[in-house]
Amino acid sequence: MSVLIALPKGRLLKEVQNLFKKIDIEFDIDSRKLIIDTSQKWLKVAILRTWDIPKFVNYGAADIGVVGKDILYESKLENNFYELMDLKIGNCRMSLASLDDKIPSNKKIKVASKYPEYTKKYFSSKSKDIDLLILKGAIEIAPILGISDCIVDLVQTGKTLKELSLIHISEPTRHPLI
């Protein structure tokens, strides 16, 4: 019997691979296979879209997974999992950003994000009424083009926000093993 671990595609995959190498688990991230053998006969990996990992673990298709707290929260499945450990990789923060340092207080706030649950929770905690525009990419351009007052998005270095003259308030996000 083997254990199947769901790993995220994209920039986190290399960090996870390096972490696994430290404990003598190696695998080929360039493999075209859907389920990849590792150097440990008892362990296999599936490289999946990050947003799908909580579902694969929840339905028992994968035994464990690596996913960000942001994705886990957005999946609405966070109460179904135990966080086994914080892998201390993929350091980023959830950022509320706008073209100036003030969010309108006298009107409904137009917010662009691909994190609707987090966004609703944040603004609800501030007793702010929002009009939420859910986007899948290029979130940063929404206030520049005038379709939102602000954005809620993940930020790693803040370089893109700075280049676009966006000002942000942030909260840490971690990537646990679930």
What does each model-found stretch correspond to?
Residues 167-178:
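Single conserved hydrophobic/aromatic residue that forms the stacking wall/gate
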Residues 147-159, 164-166:
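A C-terminal functional module that forms or caps the active site or interfaces directly
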Residues 2-36, 93-143, 147:
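Bilobed "Venus flytrap"/periplasmic-binding protein-like clamshell domains
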Residues 49-51, 60-72, 138, 154-159:
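Beta->alpha turn/N-cap motifs
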Residues 59-90:
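Glycine/small-residue-rich loop that forms an oxyanion/phosphate-binding "nest" at active or ligand-binding sites
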